[in-house]
Swiss-Prot record:
Gene3D superfamilies: P-loop containing nucleotide triphosphate hydrolases
Signal peptide coordinates: none
Binding site for GTP: 32-39, 59-63, 86-89, 153-156, 184-186
Protein name per Swiss-Prot or TrEMBL: Probable GTP-binding protein EngB
Family: Belongs to the TRAFAC class TrmE-Era-EngA-EngB-Septin-like GTPase superfamily. EngB GTPase family.
Gene this protein is translated from: engB
One annotated Gene Ontology cellular component of this protein: cytosol
InterPro entries linked to this entry: G_ENGB_dom (IPR030393), GTP-bd (IPR006073), GTP-bd_ribosome_bio_YsxC (IPR019987), P-loop_NTPase (IPR027417)
Domain EngB-type G: residue ranges: 24-205
One biological process term in Gene Ontology: division septum assembly
Listed cofactors: Mg(2+)
Length: 216
């Protein structure tokens, strides 16, 4: 049964750990190449067009952006709460090396130290085989010990006859099991319910993997 979104709102932008939202609300982070469609995905998941600003300019997100979402896993259930964190996109060449290094350090600090982080959604463009940056990102996320969910976006840009092969290519390149990558299209609404089911499962999983090095 589809998740029902009760409310969603932008919380804040942060660049340093002291600025991160406080509290115990479970969090899921979203990461992918610049212009892969993160903002469109967040707007589709939160059922609020324009909540996350969509830009035609790659590399626009230069800080962590947090959004609070209340949802019901079933119509009769009490609302539950989850927080989404939009991470800066990777692979954008038109920024300085210094700026890219700053983004990388900011993201690494977040992934390593954020206690309430339950999983990371890695977003890849289904129209193309995963890039070296995508493969490296998947390996890096696994090395942190975080749970990784993969979504193949922009499926609407592909003919339906090519979608299955595109999904298999994503799963093969990222060493995923068959059916592990969620096909997604913000335009068609494809994959919204399937991805929400995995998000809700991760958000309520108290046994989610701890980050590598936690407790050391």
């Amino acid at each position: 049964m589809p998740v029902q979104v009760v409310s969603s709102e932008f919380v804040k932008t942060a660049t340093r750990p002291p600025e991160w939202p406080r509290g115990q609300t479970p969090e899921l982070a979203f990461v992918g190449r610049s212009n892969v469609g993160k903002s469109s995905m967040l707007n589709a998941l939160t059922r609020k067009k324009g909540l996350a600003r969509v830009s035609a300019t790659p590399g626009r997100t230069r800080a962590l952006q947090f959004f609070d979402v209340a949802y019901r896993p079933t119509p009769a259930a009490r609302p539950r709460h989850v927080r989404f964190c939009d991470l800066p996109g990777y692979g954008y060449a038109k920024v300085s090396r210094e700026e890219r290094d700053r983004w990388a350090a900011m993201i690494e600090d977040y992934l390593r130290d954020r206690d309430v982080l339950r999983a990371v959604v890695l977003i890849v463009d289904a129209r193309h085989a995963p890039s070296d940056s995508d493969v490296d990102a998947a390996a890096f996320l696994r090395a942190t010990g975080r749970r990784v969910l993969v979504a193949a976006t922009k499926m609407d840009k592909l003919p339906k006859t090519r979608r299955g092969a595109a999904l298999r290519a994503v799963e093969g390149a990222l060493a995923l099991a068959k059916g592990e990558a969620v096909p997604f299209s913000a335009v068609e609404g494809t994959g919204t319910d399937a991805l929400w089911a995995r998000i809700a499962s991760a958000a309520t999983d108290e046994g989610a993997p701890a980050p590598a090095g936690a407790g050391a």
